[in-house]
From Swiss-Prot:
Alphabetized UniProt keyword annotations: Chloroplast, mRNA processing, Plastid, RNA-binding, tRNA processing
Protein's name in the database: Maturase K
Domain of life: Eukaryota
UniProt key word tRNA processing: yes
Function text: Usually encoded in the trnK tRNA gene intron. Probably assists in splicing its own and other chloroplast group II introns.
UniProt xrefs under InterPro entries: Domain_X (IPR024937), Maturase_MatK (IPR002866), Maturase_MatK_N (IPR024942)
Family per record: Belongs to the intron maturase 2 family. MatK subfamily.
Subcellular location: Plastid, Chloroplast
Lineage: Eukaryota, Viridiplantae, Streptophyta, Embryophyta, Tracheophyta
Origin species: Mandragora officinarum (Mandrake)
First-listed, main subcellular location of the protein, grouped into a coarse class: plastid
Length: 511
């Protein structure tokens, strides 16, 4: 690590800063570190196949870059359209090798910055860096703030129309001109925009090849587009409000009143901000983002046109206003990260007594609600041939050649993964329906293998053969809980967000 920092830290003997990534491309130990990074990376229990290719070698990247600069411009290959003229070899294979090596090297400054920022919190309770990568870490962030807000902007982030925009975005982070020239040469030589984005429809997906390299470029581009929110958020907000649920208890109520008096005594203008501040709340996952506010519809409409003009002017994008939708939180549900999220009123009754008179007060408290979308889940199961489009379980013929234990293990793994990911659902009834479909599909697959009916097979083998499905949701209750519950029964009934979910496999991949 000291060798790496030597290229990235300023030199005390000169006025220039090293900050050079290009020399690292030709250092032997970099590829050894990259290899160890790929093997020792923390994996989610949902990520069964890391996708690490044992035939891949980072040492080849050095030789490829050398050949790129020693190319013969008079050499032409006419036999294979997928071969690069100056390499004479498979173009997609070499592009993957170079992109993976370059992606690891260009991530080094960001990793060092993350380590230094986390080290500054010594003595304080913070989540570990790998927990911050969890998909579920976003939901407590939504849960704590969305109950205060009124309107939300559903935004589909536009993709860059030209590869040069990606290179220009990195100029603010990578000061090494040689690395930028190599990146520009590599992008224009190997790729076009169509190879990066597989679909230009709303909710587009990215190419499955060279994912690490492209995600780094895309995240840099999105970070640049989101940088304006940081500035505007700091300009418009000075004091956060307290959760509505906390106001039911008097100790928190008096605490908030004391805070108001303290702020009022110091700065009267800040007290006005508490009541007039629209309180923006922004969150993003992949290509979809949400901007919520407690302002009016007119304010949200202004934000909509501001974002359109911002993307058009800064990134030369023709961004249609139809990609941004204004919805009221109390009337609409949002399909976000596999959940149907909404804000609903939760009635609460409080008993109050003054002297000899007692009376009841009905309060409506806003609550962030998360539901499991049953129709998309059944569609995924039908696509993977576990059931029909109507949700009727069917057998999985392609697994009939496996052993009984392997068949049960595969079905049980899918069931556990679904229960693990959707543990934050407010209502678990949908999950038990999915569990029933998978359990019956497993039984029919086993019966098909043994050439018998489901009833005959279960009677001969015993119901304990599928016992794994009965305990699938209890086997994952050993991880981090952001919220503690007062009782064990409350843990099983409440929403649970886990901090080890980095990705979830598509059911269609189980062939």
């Amino acid at each position: 690590m000291e060798e790496i920092q030597r290229y990235l830290q300023p030199d005390s003997s000169s006025s220039q800063q090293h900050n050079f990534l290009y020399p690292l491309i030709f250092q032997e130990y970099i590829y050894a570190l990259a290899h160890d990074h790929g093997l020792n990376r923390n994996r989610s229990i949902l990520l069964e196949n890391p996708g690490y290719n044992n035939k891949f070698s980072f040492l080849i990247v050095k030789r490829l870059i050398t050949r790129m600069y020693q190319q013969n411009h008079f050499r032409i290959s006419t036999n294979d359209s997928n071969k690069n003229p100056f390499l004479g070899c498979n173009k997609s294979l070499y592009s993957q090798m170079i992109s993976e090596g370059f992606a690891f090297i260009v991530e080094i400054p960001f990793s060092l910055r993350l380590i230094s920022s986390l080290s500054s919190f010594e003595g304080k309770k913070i989540f570990k860096s790998h927990n911050l990568r969890s998909i579920h870490s976003t939901f407590p962030f939504l849960e704590d703030n969305f109950a205060h807000l009124n309107y939300v902007l559903d935004i589909l982030i536009p993709y860059p129309v030209h590869l040069e925009i990606l290179v220009q975005t990195l100029r603010y982070w990578v000061k090494d001109a040689s690395s930028l020239h190599l990146l520009r040469f590599f992008l224009h030589e190997y790729w076009n925009l169509n190879s990066l984005i597989t679909s230009k429809k709303p909710g587009y997906s990215f190419s499955k090849t060279n994912q690490r390299f492209f995600f780094f470029l895309y995240n840099s581009y999105v970070y640049e587009s989101e940088s304006t929110f940081v500035f505007l958020r700091n300009q418009s907000s000075h004091l956060r409000s307290t959760s509505f649920g906390a106001l039911l208890e008097r100790i928190y109520f008096y605490g908030k009143i004391e805070r108001l008096v303290e702020v009022f005594a110091k700065d009267f203008q800040v007290t006005l901000w508490l009541f007039k501040d629209p309180f923006m709340h922004y969150v993003r996952y992949q290509g979809k983002s949400i901007l919520a506010s407690k302002g009016t519809f007119l304010l949200m409409n202004k934000w909509k046109f501001y974002l359109v003009n911002f993307w058009q002017c800064n990134f030369s994008l023709c961004f249609p206003t139809g990609r941004i939708h204004i919805n009221q939180l109390s009337n609409h549900s949002r399909d976000f990260m596999g959940y149907l999220s909404s804000v609903r009123l939760n009635p609460s009754m409080v008993r109050s007594q003054m002297l000899e008179n007692a009376f009841l007060i009905n309060n409506g408290i806003k609550k962030f609600d998360t539901l499991v979308p049953i129709i998309p889940l059944i569609g995924s199961l039908a696509k993977a041939n576990f059931c029909t489009v109507l949700g009727h379980p069917i057998s999985k013929p392609v697994w009939s050649d496996l052993s009984d234990s392997d068949i049960i293990d595969r079905f049980g793994r899918i069931c556990r993964n679904l229960f693990h990911y959707y543990s934050g659902s407010s209502k678990k009834k949908t999950l038990y329906r999915i569990k029933y479909i998978l359990r019956l599909s497993c039984a029919r697959t086993l019966a098909r293998k043994h050439k018998s009916t489901v009833r005959t097979f279960l009677k001969r083998s015993g119901s304990e053969l599928l016992e794994e499905f009965l305990t699938s949701e209890e086997q994952v209750l050993s991880l981090t809980f952001p919220r503690a519950s007062s009782s064990l029964w409350g843990v099983y009934r409440s929403r649970i967000w886990y901090l080890d979910i980095f990705c979830i496999n598509d059911l269609a991949n189980y062939q």
